[in-house]
Amino acid sequence: MRRLLWIAMLSMAMAGWLSSPAACCASTRCPWLNAATAGGVLGGEVQVDLTPPTVQGDLTCEFSRGQGSSAYKLHIAVHTMQDPSKEFKRYLSRCDGQRVPLKAIGNEAVQCVLKNSSTVSEEQVIGRVRERVFILTLVRYTSASPNAGLSEDTRNLAEQVAGNLF
């Protein structure tokens, strides 16, 4: 009888161990965007780098495809602000180009019109959802007109990040 009890306990322990995810193989995921979506925008399989999350849940996700100076990159940074009315202006000052307001993305968002070369296209959106700010930067190697405006991909990414922050 004792032997059956031990066998039953051992079987239950093994079943529990086999059904739980392995700690060594667990991966942290970007809460704002998944790798498949980023890969679709960047044109292939991506590598994901994350900063450790803060107590408030702030996190930076960087998706990249390729290596070195020719890498395609998507950088998403999310920060919590103590005083959004004052602090958001500081984040907007990071905009290196002309600011164009964007409607229906979070509580407030702007496109930073950056200078594009004939081979590199860089787009940036800075937005706010309640007390959280997000900065989305997309770098791709394509021919882009300097006056092309915000690409549909970048707008969709900004909408998805803002939606995940609500």
Regions found by a protein language model. Name each.
Residues 21-62, 142, 147, 151-166:
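N-terminal "mature-domain start" segment
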Residues 14, 25-28, 33, 64, ...:
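General secretory precursor processing signal
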